[in-house]
Amino acid sequence: MTDSYNSSRLPKIVFFHGLNNNTGCFGPLMSHFRESGFETEMVILPCHGENRKEAKNSKDALRVFAQSMKRLEKTSYFAIAFSHGALYLQLWMEKNPGNKPLKQILLAPALFIRKQKLIEKAMKILPSFVLVKSLAPKAFRRYEILTAGEYNILVQGIVTYQKIMNQLKVPSLVMIDPKDELVHAQNLKAKLEEKNKGLEVQFIERPYLKKGIGCHHILFHPDYYEKQDWEEFLQKLHSFLKV
């Protein structure tokens, strides 16, 4: 399925991946939008590019992310942001009133996570070098395993966001699988809808999905949908991005 657009006036679509995702994770979705006439690019999250150690904590990571966003200062763009990438984008918009996306699609945004208080306590105890198993499917992983310090950048970002969260800064489509293993889908829906009048967080249900731990967190890839459901998912994205 492709929608017809006038490519001469289309904003760019900028993608933001999640924690421990590689640059190929959005491949099919980016190709789909390019075939529809959009120009696409991806923002690489802190510690996921050439320098894995460029940020030691959430504050460092947000500084690095803000530097990456400078290249979009004069760009008209839509954002499609997944998980940790969605968190970075919201934190950046809270502090940077500059060139925000025209619209944003948030896929399983890591703004509220399951067992959050327990995880926060664990992160305070664990040395930063302790290895933590990645829930990202192997095909989408940047690294085979994470450190507690790298995972804590996500956790502390979530804590910060929850302290300062307000209304979403731009028109938003938010989608989440209610069985998401990382994001607390029900809390996400309740909190965002409470803060944003008229917003409906959409549940994407896939009862047939049996690809192991972490599979319900993946919303961006056709291998995690039956064909008709993937087509419906794409249609929702296109309908929201109509210009």
Predicted regions and their residues:
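Short alpha-helix in the alpha/beta-hydrolase fold that links the catalytic acid
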Residues: 184-194
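Active-site signature of alpha/beta-hydrolase-fold catalytic machinery across serine-
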Residues: 28, 91-95
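The alpha/beta-hydrolase serine catalytic core
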Residues: 109-170, 177-183, 202-234
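Short, surface-exposed "cap/lid" segments of acyl-processing enzymes
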Residues: 2-48
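Gly/Ala-rich beta-loop-alpha elbow adjacent to hydrolase catalytic centers
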Residues: 80-89
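Catalytic nucleophile-loop/oxyanion-hole region of alpha/beta-hydrolase
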Residues: 48-73
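C-terminal alpha-helix
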Residues: 232, 236-243
